[in-house]
Amino acid sequence: MSAAVKQIAFIINPISGSRKTQQVKRQVPQLVSQLLDHEQWSPALVQTEYAGHATVLARQYAAEGYDAVVAVGGDGTVSEVAQGLLNTSTAMGIIPMGSGNGFALHLGIPTDAGKAILLLNRCKTISVDYGMANDKLFISTCGTGFDAEVAERFAGNTQRGLFAYVRTVLHLVFAYRPQTYRLVAESLYGEQQPFDISRRAFLITFANANQWGNNARIAPHANLQDGKMDVMILSRHALLDALPLAWRLFTGTIDRSLLVRTLRARQLTLHRQTAAAFHIDGNPVAMPADVTIRIMPHGFNVLVDNNTQAK
C-alpha cells in the first residue's frame, strides 16, 4: 500500500432514518466502491449492532491509527462516533442518513449519499467544539421545554421524518404548560459575561450548532469553533404567533423575533422547578432539575468540503 493512502472506516447504523433512507444505506458499500478515491483512501466498512456500538468502534479505529472514521446514520450515530474520537487526531466524516441531520447540515455536508462520499475526495479537516450537559455529551443542541417534550413523544413514534415530527408537535401544542427557569452564568475568571436571569419560557435551547435538524435553525449564528453556546430563550406565546415563528425558524431569522432572547456563554447552570423533559441532540434523556451545561473547545476533528469556511 502506498504511504500516501489513508485509512478510513465507515460505521453504518442500519436502522437510523426512514425506510427510504435505510434502502439507500444498503447501497453505501457499492457507492463507496464506485465513488471514493481509492488512490487517496483505503476503506473499511462495518455495521453497528447495538446502542453505543459506534462509540466503541470509533475509539477502536482511532487507537489503530485510522485517519478518518465516517458516521453513516443520523445525529445519534454522529454523536456516538464523535464521542469515540474525542481528543484524537482521527477525523470524523459524515454521510447523513437520519431524520434530521442537523450537525451535517450546519457543516454544509450534502444529504445525498453519493455527494457526501465524493466530498471525502476533496475535503479538509477542521477542529470543532462539543458540549456537555452534566455528564452527557452533545454535538448540536440540548434543551428543555416544549421541544424536549416533543422529543420524548417522538421517540415513541414508529414513523420518522419531518412530517411525523410536525404531527407530534401539533398533538402536543395545545396541552403543553411552560415552567419558569433560572439561568446562572459565573464570570469564569473573566472568560464570559456573568448573568442570573429567570424566565417563564416555552423552551430553552443550548446550541453548539445552529439547528435542530431539517434546517430548523434555532440558533442561526451559532459557531462550532468559537468555544461558546448560543442560549435561545423562546417566551410563551399565542397560538397565532406559531406560524410566523416557524417561518423564522426555517429562514434563519428566529433570533430577530421579539419573543426570542439570545444569550452566549461558555458554561452555565440551568435551574428548573421540576426534572421535566430534557433532550440531547434531539434524543430524550433523564436529567435532574439542575443541569450544568458547558462547551468544550476544539474537542474533535471533522472532514468538510475544501471550500467550507470556519463556522
Where do the language-model regions lie?
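Catalytic core of DAGKc-family lipid kinases
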Residues: 48, 87-91, 95-203
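Gly/Ser/Thr-rich active-site loops/lids in small-molecule metabolic enzymes
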Residues: 156-167, 220-241
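Glycine-rich phosphate/pyrophosphate-binding beta-alpha loops
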Residues: 143, 147, 205-221, 284
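ATP/nucleoside-binding phosphotransfer catalytic cores, i.e., glycine-rich phosphate-binding loops
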Residues: 198, 223, 233-311
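Short Gly/Thr/Asp-enriched flexible loops that form oxyanion-binding sites at enzyme active sites
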Residues: 76-90
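N-terminal glycine-rich "phosphate-gripper" loop used for MgATP/nucleotide binding
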Residues: 71-75
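ATP/NTP phosphate-donor binding region
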Residues: 1-69, 309-311
